[in-house]
C-alpha cells in the first residue's frame, strides 16, 4: 500500500450550512442569535476543507447550484482548494440550518432543505469528466447524499465507471446509495453506527455485532472506517480492527456537525502524509493507524468548534493523546444475532 497520486472528492448534493447560536433555545416565540455563520458544506466539501487544513490537496468535482457557483468557488479558493471542478446546474444549492444552544450541549436542532434537481445531460457531463480523473493510482471518494434526479443505481454506475478506469473508490453515504455501493469492491466505506446496523440488517448496535458486521464488509472492501461519535472510530481490514479514541468532557463539546466528515478528511490527509515504507502495514509506525490517529484528532478538535473547522497545529497537539488499540475480529461468517 502507498499514498495515492491524486485524491478526487465527488460531492453530488452539497449544501450551504447556516449555524445559529441561540442561548436557551426553545421552539416558538422570538429569540436572538448570539452568533451566525454561513459557509459551503456537505460531506465532500467538509472532507476537502479538512484535507487542505491539514496540508494535503484534493480535486473537488460534482454539482453546485448556479446561483451559488461563483461564491462557492471563491470561498473554497480562500480555503486553499485550488482544483475545484464543480458543475453548475440550474437552481439553488440547498441550505441546512443548525441551531446550537451553548447551554445544552448535544441538543442541536437541524433543518434541511431540498436543493436542485440533476438532469440527465448534467449527469452525463459529470460522467465524462470523471473518466480522466479515475486513472490507476488515484482515489475517487464519493461523499454525501444523492440529489433529486440521481438514483442509487446511477450512483453505483458512477462508481463502476471509476473502478473500471483503474481508480480506487471510497464511499461515505447512507441509505439506498450505501447499500448499492457496499456490494462493490471499494477501497473504503465509512458508515456510522446506525448506518452499519441498517446495512447489515441488525437492530442491535453492540460493539461485538458492529465489529462482526464490519469484518464481513471487509471481506470485499479493503477498509471499513466506522465512525462512533464520541466513542472514537474503528478501522477494520481483513485482519484486525484498530480502535482509536480521544475522550472529550461534555462541557468541551460545542457542535458535532460535520465531525464525521472531518474524521474522513483527516484520515485521508494522514494517509497521504504518512511515511510509507516497503513491506506490509505491520511496520512501526503503522501508517494506517497513524492516518486513523490524525482523523480522530481532527474530528475531536472540530467538536470543540461551532463550525467544522480545524487547525493543523492544534490537531497535531492532540494526536499523542489518541489511544489506539487492536481488537481481535469476531468470526465474520457467523455474526451474532
Predicted regions and their residues:
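Positively charged, low-complexity intrinsically disordered leader regions
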Residues: 1-28
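Substrate-binding N-lobe of the ribokinase-like
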Residues: 32-94
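Short beta-strand scaffold segments in enzyme catalytic cores
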Residues: 49, 95-99, 232-236
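Short, conserved phosphate/pyrophosphate- and ester-handling motifs at nucleotide-, phospho-/glycolipid
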Residues: 51, 192, 260
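Conserved phosphate-binding/catalytic loop of the ribokinase/pfkB sugar-kinase fold
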Residues: 88, 98-136
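Conserved beta-alpha-beta core of the PfkB/ribokinase-like small-molecule kinase fold
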Residues: 127, 139-209
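Conserved phosphate-binding/catalytic region of the ribokinase-like
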Residues: 179, 207-337
